[in-house]
Amino acid sequence: MAPALVLLVAMAATVTRAPFGKMPDGATVDIYTLTNIHGMEARIMTYGAVVVSLKTPDRSGRLDDVVLGFDNFEDYLTRSRFFGAVAGRYANRIGNARFSLDGTTYELAANNGKNHLHGGRRGFDKVVWKGEPIDRGGDVGVALTYVSADGEEG
């Protein structure tokens, strides 16, 4: 399975990529910043495909961040409660960390007491996605992909 997330911001926009942090295994986590001529700015990191911030002007033109999140990468590793992340392989709880489908019972990783929550111990919010900037003549975005192997997390 290769989930993909694509965010496009139109109207004379720009996209930039910069290092944002390092995983404990040394993998680099990047952050993409998308801006448009109206001052709107979206920041998306490759760890968890997290929307780190979304700044938009109010009716007086003042920018304000409208999403919950942290200013530094380390807090996402130690304090995150799914802020801005892609939840999955399944969003919500699966009771007793198991389910049956077409006569087969699947055992999942229990990470919420005896339950499976938001994709398990290593859900989509805990992996580094591959990021690619998109620029289609002024319409910009970032394509994020992650391949989840069959049986990963249960």
Regions found by a protein language model. Give the residues of each.
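Composition- and surface-driven signal marking solvent-exposed, interaction-prone regions
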Residues: 1-2, 47
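Bacterial N-terminal signal peptides
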Residues: 2-10
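Surface-exposed acidic/polar loop and edge beta-strand patches at domain peripheries
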Residues: 12-154
